[in-house]
């Protein structure tokens, strides 16, 4: 059993892009930015608890931070993790929350 306080720290927010919008419409898949150390089981449990939906599958990937130059120095952005969460048939997550 995963502790509730850990579940609240797993999901950092939705990842909104053209690709994620198309996936949401066609495949009932939602994309989230998640903690870099989060497991698929934790992500599945967190989405199920926070949004009260049934989750079919979770796919994850780690985006490597880009190298950027500032002045004469070379820096690097942080790595971050993205999760593609496929919801069960009929399940839906409304991020807007009643806006018309």
From Swiss-Prot:
Molecular function terms, GO-annotated: rRNA binding; structural constituent of ribosome
Protein's GO biological process: translation
PROSITE patterns for this protein: RIBOSOMAL_L23 (PS00050)
GO CC terms of this entry: ribonucleoprotein complex; ribosome
Keyword Cell cycle included in the entry's annotation: no
Disulfide partners: none
Pfam family, one: Ribosomal_L23
Similarity-based family: Belongs to the universal ribosomal protein uL23 family.
Function (record text): One of the early assembly proteins it binds 23S rRNA. One of the proteins that surrounds the polypeptide exit tunnel on the outside of the ribosome. Forms the main docking site for trigger factor binding to the ribosome.
PANTHER family: 60S RIBOSOMAL PROTEIN L23A
HAMAP family: Ribosomal_uL23_B (MF_01369_B)
Protein name as it appears in the record: Large ribosomal subunit protein uL23
Organism: Shewanella frigidimarina (strain NCIMB 400)
């Amino acid at each position: 059993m995963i502790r509730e306080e850990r579940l609240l720290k797993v999901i950092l927010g939705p990842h909104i892009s053209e690709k994620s919008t198309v996936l949401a419409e066609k495949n009932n898949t939602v994309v989230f930015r998640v903690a870099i150390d989060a497991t698929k089981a934790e992500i599945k449990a967190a989405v199920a608890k926070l949004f009260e939906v049934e989750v079919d599958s979770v796919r994850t990937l780690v985006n490597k931070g880009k190298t950027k130059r500032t002045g004469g120095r070379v820096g690097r952005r942080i790595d971050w993790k993205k999760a593609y969460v496929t919801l069960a048939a009929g399940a839906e997550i409304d991020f807007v929350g009643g806006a018309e």
